[in-house]
Amino acid sequence: MSAAPVVDAEYMAEVERARRDLRALIASKSCAPIMLRLAWHDAGTYDKATKTGGPNGSIRFPQEYSHAANAGIKIAIDLLEPMKQKHPKITYADLYQLAGVVAVEVTGGPTIDYVPGRRDSSDSPEEGRLPDAKKGAAHLREVFYRMGLSDKDIVALSGGHTLGKARPERSGFDGAWTKDPLKFDNSYFIELLKENSEGLLKLPTDKALVEDPTFRRYVELYAKDEDAFFRDYAESHKKLSELGFTPPRSAFIYKSCQKPKSLLMQTAAGVAVAAAVVAWAYLCESNKRLG
């Protein structure tokens, strides 16, 4: 495990530059789905009992990206390598999670709170920690509970399937979960509740969300209330992206310093507008009297 990056103003500025570059890359390559998958698969190996795995950039090594569940993920790793060379200060772990956050946002999804400072690691976990699409509810709970996540997290994060499609050469399955696989919305849950979604994919793990009564409550909620889905998804995605990671205090200090500055600028602008309105009203009244 490498040393944690120093998250200072310079690092945060580099993160914002990388964020802009990621928006452009994802828009030009239409690669939001695989960027979200990369972020998920790097983080989703976490084991809270042993404190191993998690969002540490180890997925960039052959011993991990060659796992069966990661078939095709090298495409995203290769797309991001020039970005890493352009922004060398940022760790792979931070870059991969930032790519996932941006992928959701640029496709119409919620804004996800992102705090940098993750360490890079070359220690890859053993194969088999990611969900197996051919299994059901008990398996999903086993995998997500191992990470320290909840039933709500399971369903909310499954909503990420609103982006992208399964490919037979990668998973053995073929097709998209929604009619617009490049738009982040709640249509995944709407389609899940339909008895027949012609031409759309429903994996055994997807069907488990409807068959399990606890999971189904969240599916029904998210299908009828996209705002609720976006709120819960943003919360669950943040939890996933920070598994085993304690954000550095410096990042919070930086963010807190930015908010008052922004608020001050907004307040100053508001005062200036109000003063202009008062001055204009006074001028109009004076003109009336002179007339």
UniProtKB/Swiss-Prot annotation:
Expressed in stems. GO terms for biological process: cellular response to oxidative stress; hydrogen peroxide catabolic process; response to reactive oxygen species. K(+) binds at residues 162, 178, 185. Keywords: Calcium, Heme, Hydrogen peroxide, Iron, Membrane, Metal-binding, Oxidoreductase, Peroxidase, Peroxisome, Potassium, Transmembrane, Transmembrane helix. It is found in: Peroxisome membrane. Its main location: membrane. Its cofactor is heme b. It catalyses: L-ascorbate + H2O2 = L-dehydroascorbate + 2 H2O. Binds 1 heme b (iron(II)-protoporphyrin IX) group. The chain crosses the membrane at residues 263-283. Residues 114-133 are annotated as: Disordered. Residues 116-133 have a biased composition (Basic and acidic residues). The record marks 37 as: Transition state stabilizer. The keyword Membrane applies. Its EC number is 1.11.1.11. The keyword Calcium applies. GO terms for molecular function: heme binding; L-ascorbate peroxidase activity; metal ion binding; peroxidase activity. CDD domains: ascorbate_peroxidase. Binds one cation per subunit; probably K(+), but might also be Ca(2+). Plays a key role in hydrogen peroxide removal. This is Probable L-ascorbate peroxidase 3, peroxisomal. It comes from Oryza sativa subsp. japonica (Rice). The gene is APX3.
